[in-house]
Amino acid sequence: MATFTIHQRKLGKDKVDQINTDSNSDMANTYFRMGLVNGDNVDELVAATFDHDIYRMTTCLQVVSDHALTVIFDHMNGHTCDDVHNEIVLMKRPSMSVGDIVTNTGSGTSWVCMPFGWHELGMQIETKIAA
């Protein structure tokens, strides 16, 4: 059984106000680009998104499967998955979509959900739950 965390782009009122005030700001462009991410510079874009404090850890899952990313994607999109053994929802979350990050807490490996499939990141994602 492996434990995974899911980070999703979640904007508080202050970030929404910043985007509405200046939709061409670096933070706004980073947020929008992450929702349309393609194969170019994914690691740099993810790092910038964390720098702008846009990602939030929303969920922790324990999964038993050789196809954990598929199971997680299906589960996060409302499909019943017998391979998900435990779920901790840390905050209200949307379904899984492009730009969301899944991290295996044991190996430290992270993947970004892409328009088609997954991109393995070459960077470490913080998986500690803040007190």
Label for each model-derived stretch:
Residues F32-R33, D51, R56, V112, ...:
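Short linear interaction motif-like sites in intrinsically disordered regions of transcription factors
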Residues T5, N29-T30, A48, D53, ...:
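Intrinsically disordered, low-complexity segments enriched in small/polar residues
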